[in-house]
Amino acid sequence: GELIRKSAMGGYTLSYHFMDLRDEKTNIQEKTAMDKPHHLMVYITDKNNKPVLKGKVGFMIKNAQGITQKAMGMFMSEGFGTTADMKQKGVYTISSKAILGDKKLVDKFEYEIR
């Protein structure tokens, strides 16, 4: 997926990647039938640039109308990912909270769907 944000905090780097799963589909009916066609991943690395493989990550995605989706990230491909419905054009506020042992990392940013 496309790198949409990179932030550093508390000795960690968080890299967010965004992907529209509909891009992989060729059948128009499959594309329109997808409830949550967007995939959001965060890859977390420590100060030595090693991937963080244990922890919990939660996502909160709010659209321009204030409708919020909450999801726990699943560990996959050395990162934490979730699916979401971001089909409506506009600016989304994406918040993440990562619990890594005794460390808590909270991040928030905006991403526009055009």
Describe the predicted segments one by one.
Residues 1-39:
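Beta-strand-rich domain onsets/edges
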Residues 49-53:
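A short beta-turn/strand-edge loop motif at beta-sheet boundaries
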Residues 36-48:
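Beta-strand-rich structural segments
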Residues 104-113:
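Edge beta-strands of extracellular beta-sandwich domains
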Residues 58-71:
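Short amphipathic beta-strand segments in non-cytosolic proteins
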Residues 71-100:
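Short, solvent-exposed, Trp/other aromatic-anchored flexible loops in extracytoplasmic proteins
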Residues 2, 25-28, 67-69, 78-82:
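Short structured motifs
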